[in-house]
Every structure is written in structure tokens, then in C-alpha cells.
Amino acid sequence: MANIKSAIKRAELNVKQNEKNSAQKSAMRTAIKAFEANPSEELFRAASSAIDKAETKGLIHKNKASRDKARLSAKLAK
């Protein structure tokens, strides 16, 4: 455990940020799974939006976001 006051604060903030990041990533995965279970235009838009939000927040790399969206788009076109 941290001894310095600023380190204690940073540790607390890290825990909070980790929870936010985990929730955002989980929401992205849930949206993708919902689309894969039942491909539709509406679910594609929701999944694509979730991927973009995760990429903007730095949770996933931009190339992974692009790759995931391309795969979803290909599945929608089928």
C-alpha cells in the first residue's frame, strides 16, 4: 500500500478509472455479441458506436476498432 498522500490518491483514482474502463469494454463486448446473435442494421450501428467509443477512450487500438467494425460489416452484408 502506498505511504505518500498523493500516491494514495492516485491508487484510489486508478481503481475508479479501472471500473469505468471495465464497464465501457464490457458494454462494447455485449453490443458485439448482441449483433452476432441477431445481425441487423440497428444492432450494427449500436455495436459500431460502442467500438468507436472504446477506441476514442483508448481502451482498444484504432486498428483493432477498424478490424472489428470491418468484420461486423462483412457479417451484416452476408
Swiss-Prot record:
Matches recorded under Gene3D superfamilies: Ribosomal protein S20
Gene Ontology biological-process entries: translation
InterPro entries: Ribosomal_bS20 (IPR002583), Ribosomal_bS20_sf (IPR036510)
NCBIfam families according to UniProt: S20
HAMAP family registered for this protein in UniProt: Ribosomal_bS20
Entry's family note: Belongs to the bacterial ribosomal protein bS20 family.
Protein name: Small ribosomal subunit protein bS20
Species this chain originates from: Streptococcus pneumoniae serotype 2 (strain D39 / NCTC 7466)
